[in-house]
A protein has these predicted regions:
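Bacterial N-terminal signal peptides that target proteins for export
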Residues: 3-15
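Bacterial N-terminal signal peptides
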Residues: 14-24
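Glycine-centered loop/turn positions within well-structured domains
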Residues: 46, 62, 88
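Short, non-ligating residues that shape and space the ligands of small metal-coordination modules
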Residues: 57-58
Length: 114
């Protein structure tokens, strides 16, 4: 069988895997209560805003707007939230946030925090 045919035969499997992965990520984020979501938005606007600007348009840290985050891998943003950035003022938040919460915050930032 040619390489192209082998690749085509794997496409349904790959598509199913990616769909399952996306669904699992969505379900994990859905477990964050409405109350906790409100707390996270407050944290984002107040704590993150103290460095990234109260409107998240930038300050000590870079802007956190959809257009400035466009194209950045979600995993990179989540890791930055949880682990911080060595050599910068960006602290790690892993003692205050779960992986799911960091993913939820990332989605909010990519969509534009309201």
């Amino acid at each position: 069988m040619s390489w192209k045919k082998q690749s085509m035969n794997r496409m349904p499997f790959i598509a199913s895997f990616l769909l399952a992965l996306a669904s699992a990520s969505h379900l994990a984020m859905a477990d964050i209560s409405t109350e906790r979501q409100s707390e996270l938005i407050y944290l984002l606007k107040q704590d993150c805003g103290s460095c990234h600007g109260m409107t998240l348009k930038g300050g000590l840290g870079p802007a956190l707007l959809p257009e400035t985050l466009y194209g950045k891998p979600k995993e990179l943003l989540v890791t930055t939230i949880l682990e911080g950035r060595i050599g910068t003022a960006m602290p790690p938040w892993k003692t205050m946030l779960t992986q799911d919460e960091a993913e939820w915050i990332t989605v909010q930032l990519q969509q534009g925090v309201k």
